[in-house]
């Protein structure tokens, strides 16, 4: 694997972006976090503030994106900047500006600077899939990259369109791009996103607070943010000849919300978590990631118990509480 490449991470001061930056730094790469926010709080907590350059910018501004890529001499782009589920629903015009036009601007920058930019690794999402009932055949079913794509949210629809954009830029203009479809990200410092409320199933009990949650019988793919960061690095740097496709499912550990609550209770014995079966999640979580593992060597580092334990330890330390 090459080292000392400069990687421009859009959305690089956000939750996943900060962890991606940390993972890249630890693997020998120079990193520029490109974001509308220059708040380095998460980068600081991860201990990489001094190792990551921060550049203020807006992916919805085409000239700004091209200038950022050119002036940082980025050889790779990890494109994460997006308005997530709830924000996209509340601001549909902004969602199109950022998620659709912004992604187009990133691909266009890579096309324009084709002698400089080697690859764009970017975030699609499991949200492009339909609700589980569209796939459940009553057996041990898993959704592959070739299965039905029919998003039930505006956010998912923008990601579906992004995949069409990416294919055109790859097939018509030779832009080397790889997308991954992450599921539900969890870990220290998550604050936004459509599934961010699920963080409270860990955070509230860890701090001695009660919590009520719906979707008890719904399956969630719980993907630790450090595993997602690893996946983006592999998407960015796995040699092209080892890739069998351009879009990959990635996941962590599948568990119902009730099972996740039981895992928390096993770590925090006095946890007060009330779980009901009300509600249905808008997209399936049962992703088959055989292709990504075979092509890149990706392996999940955190099962649910280990991931929750790490998460709880960080939370308690930050709040001046004794470890469990």
What are the residue ranges of the model-derived segments?
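C-terminal substrate-binding subdomain of Rossmann-fold SDR/epimerase-dehydratase oxidoreductases
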Residues: 214-217, 221-324
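Active-site YXXXK catalytic motif of short-chain dehydrogenase/reductase
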Residues: 99, 155, 159
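NAD(P)-dependent short-chain dehydrogenase/reductase
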Residues: 134, 164-220, 225, 229
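Rossmann-fold cofactor-recognition segment
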Residues: 48-60
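N-terminal Rossmann NAD(P)H-binding glycine-rich loop of SDR-like oxidoreductase domains
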Residues: 7-26
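Conserved Rossmann-fold NAD(P)-dependent oxidoreductase catalytic core, especially the SDR/UDP-sugar
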Residues: 104-154
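Conserved glycine-rich Rossmann-like NAD(P)H-binding loop of the short-chain dehydrogenase/reductase
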Residues: 29-40
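NAD(P)H-binding glycine-rich loop region in Rossmannoid oxidoreductase-like domains
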Residues: 59-98
């Amino acid at each position: 694997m090459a080292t000392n490449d400069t990687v421009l991470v859009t959305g690089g001061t956000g939750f996943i972006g900060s962890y991606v930056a940390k993972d890249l730094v630890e693997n020998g790469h120079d990193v520029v976090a490109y974001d509308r926010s220059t708040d380095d709080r998460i980068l600081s907590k991860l201990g990489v503030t001094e190792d990551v350059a921060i550049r203020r910018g807006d992916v919805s501004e085409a000239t700004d994106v091209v200038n950022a890529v050119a002036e940082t001499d980025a050889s790779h782009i990890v494109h994460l900047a997006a308005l997530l589920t709830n924000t996209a629903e509340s601001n549909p015009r902004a969602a199109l500006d950022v998620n659709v036009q912004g992604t187009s601007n990133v691909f266009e920058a890579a096309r324009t600077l084709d002698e400089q930019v080697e690859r764009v690794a970017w975030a699609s999402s499991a949200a492009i899939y339909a609700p589980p009932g569209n796939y459940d055949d009553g057996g041990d079913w898993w959704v592959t990259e070739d299965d039905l794509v029919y998003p039930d949210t505006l956010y998912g629809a923008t990601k579906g369109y992004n995949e069409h954009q990416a294919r055109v830029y790859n097939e018509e203009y030779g832009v080397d791009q790889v997308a991954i479809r992450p599921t539900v990200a969890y870990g220290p410092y998550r604050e936004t996103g459509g599934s961010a409320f699920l963080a409270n199933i860990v955070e509230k009990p860890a701090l001695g607070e009660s919590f009520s949650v719906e979707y008890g019988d719904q399956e969630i793919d719980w993907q630790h943010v450090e595993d997602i960061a690893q996946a983006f690095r592999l998407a960015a740097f796995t040699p092209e000849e080892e890739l069998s496709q351009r879009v990959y499912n990635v996941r962590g550990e599948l568990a119902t919300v009730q099972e996740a609550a039981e895992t928390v209770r096993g770590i925090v014995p006095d946890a007060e978590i009330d779980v009901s079966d009300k509600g249905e999640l808008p997209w399936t979580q049962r992703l088959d990631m055989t292709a990504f593992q075979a092509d890149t060597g990706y392996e999940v580092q955190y099962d649910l118990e280990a991931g929750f334990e790490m998460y709880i330890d960080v939370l308690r330390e930050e709040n001046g509480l004794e470890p469990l």
